[in-house]
Amino acid sequence: MIRAFGRDDRLAVMRLLRLMHQETVYSRNEVNWTKVRDRLDMHCGGYERMAGFVGDLDGDVAGVLLVGCGENWFSEQLFGFDVVFYVRPDRRGMLLGRGLLRAFEAWGREKGCCQVSIGVSSGVMVERTGRMLERLGWGHSGGIYRRDL
């Protein structure tokens, strides 16, 4: 079941974020878990232009999508963006990702966004994730390039 992320989900989402950090290119970066916890509060009702969704399978939070919306740089039109999109490895391919994306799209429409976007920047299953997004009607519009300093 896909539902809104709430304060009671913070511990479960923190566990997911720890897994995400270990699995992805972000494992090279330091983490301030107190800051992460505080940022989670922004996505569970703390800010009008931020939201979150969780994939809950019988009380087991196995996926999370944290999102926001803001004005386009060129105009006042709103666009939606993801902050975190993660599904636990043992639950991938079980429609959780699709459900989270659909919730994001609905939220974006409700907020008046003209567009929503998802970044595939984790370095994990990039091609597979891209194919899923394209099957669901999302278009590829670029890439992310990194250089460690």
In which residue ranges do the predicted regions lie?
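Conserved GNAT-fold acetyl-CoA-binding loop/helix
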Residues: 21-40
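A short helix-loop-beta-strand connector motif used in the catalytic cores of GNAT acetyltransferases and
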Residues: 41-54
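Conserved beta-strand in the GNAT
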Residues: 54, 60-69
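A conserved beta-turn-beta hairpin within the catalytic core of GNAT-like acetyltransferases
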Residues: 71-82, 141
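Conserved acetyl-CoA-binding loop-helix of GNAT-fold acetyltransferases
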Residues: 93-106
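Conserved beta-strand-loop-alpha-helix junction that forms the acyl-donor binding cleft
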Residues: 117-128
